[in-house]
């Protein structure tokens, strides 16, 4: 379950700043087909923030999509994440599901560390 970014590998795009505009631009460059979902979630997060008088929904939204970009800017990591998600969903037993879920966590950690 060794997860790493190969030495000398370059991301497809630079990691965006943690702002809605920068993250949206990265999402558009990485996969324009998810922009409708991004926009819908942004609208929901801002409405929730307004209703709750809290910045937390917006902060969670930005963090989620920032991490999405952190993974997808490395195509091999993104492919491995999709495969682990499939393995977890189709696991025949709890141990297989846990192993796939643990690998998902490691992929997210590696991507976040590389983006920091």
Language-model regions, residue ranges each:
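Intrinsic-disorder-associated interaction segments
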Residues: 12, 16, 31, 51, ...
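Exposed alpha-helical structural elements
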Residues: 22, 34-37, 57, 76, ...
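A composition-driven signal for long, intrinsically disordered, charge-rich low-complexity tracts
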Residues: 5-14, 61-64, 85, 103
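Short interaction-prone segments
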Residues: 12, 61, 70, 75-86
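Short terminal alpha-helical segments
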Residues: 2-47
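Amphipathic alpha-helical binding modules
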Residues: 78-116
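Amphipathic alpha-helical interaction modules
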Residues: 34-73
């Amino acid at each position: 379950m060794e997860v790493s970014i190969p030495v000398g590998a370059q991301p497809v795009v630079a990691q965006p700043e943690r702002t809605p505009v920068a993250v949206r631009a990265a999402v558009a460059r990485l996969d324009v087909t998810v922009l409708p979902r991004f926009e819908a979630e942004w609208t929901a997060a801002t409405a929730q923030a307004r209703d709750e008088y809290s910045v937390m929904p917006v902060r969670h939204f930005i963090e989620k999509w920032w991490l999405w970009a952190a993974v997808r800017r490395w195509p091999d990591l993104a492919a491995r994440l999709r495969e682990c998600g499939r393995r977890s969903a189709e696991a025949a037993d709890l141990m297989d599901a846990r192993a796939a879920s643990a690998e998902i966590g490691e992929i997210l950690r590696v991507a976040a560390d590389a983006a920091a």
